Amino acid sequence: MTQQQAQTHVATEGDREIVTERVFDAPRERVFQAFVDPELIPQWWGRRADTTTVDKMDVREGGEWRFVTDGPDGNTAFRGVYRAVEPPERLEQTFEWEGMPGHIVVETATFEDLGDGRTKVSTRSLFHTTEERDGMLASGMEIGLGESYEQLDELLAAGAAVD
């Protein structure tokens, strides 16, 4: 299964994974910074109709993160633990929607310097079961991810992230 949301490529791999790719028109260091800076996260993370608040963001191995989104459908929270932080190449973390506690996903994001001022971000999300993976896809995550990445494009174009 392969689907396209804006320029974000989303595919399933194996029985329990979702793999995404997106190319950003910015150097790798700037893109990585946007993923780890608590002041930048609220400017791009989540759907356009939502407001994101960073409740906790301790970007180090073993550090915790928690984001709360508030929008037309109410508020919800997501949380996890950073398992690996390797600037500007790789982030690995757990991801859990507090509305379904115990369904923890392991997400690995890699940041590839394409050599022309652009960066490819690839994420691999590993679920416990095929049903959990398929439930995430059915939840509208592709729309939310697409909107988030569009907002990140805009943020990077405005020069908001650190060089």
Spans of model-derived segments:
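Hydrophobic ligand-binding cavity/cleft-lining segments
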Residues: M1-D50
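A conserved amphipathic terminal alpha-helix motif
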Residues: M1-Q3, A84, H128-D163
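Beta-strand/loop substructures that line and gate deep hydrophobic ligand-binding cavities in soluble
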Residues: E17, E92-G146
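Short beta-edge strand/loop motif at the mouth of beta-sheet-based domains
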Residues: V19, E39-A77, V162-D163
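Hydrophobic/aromatic beta-strand elements that line small-molecule binding cavities or substrate pockets
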Residues: T20-R22, D55-M57, F78-A84, F95-E96, ...
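Hydrophobic pocket/interface hotspot
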Residues: V31-F35, I41, W65-F67, Y82, ...
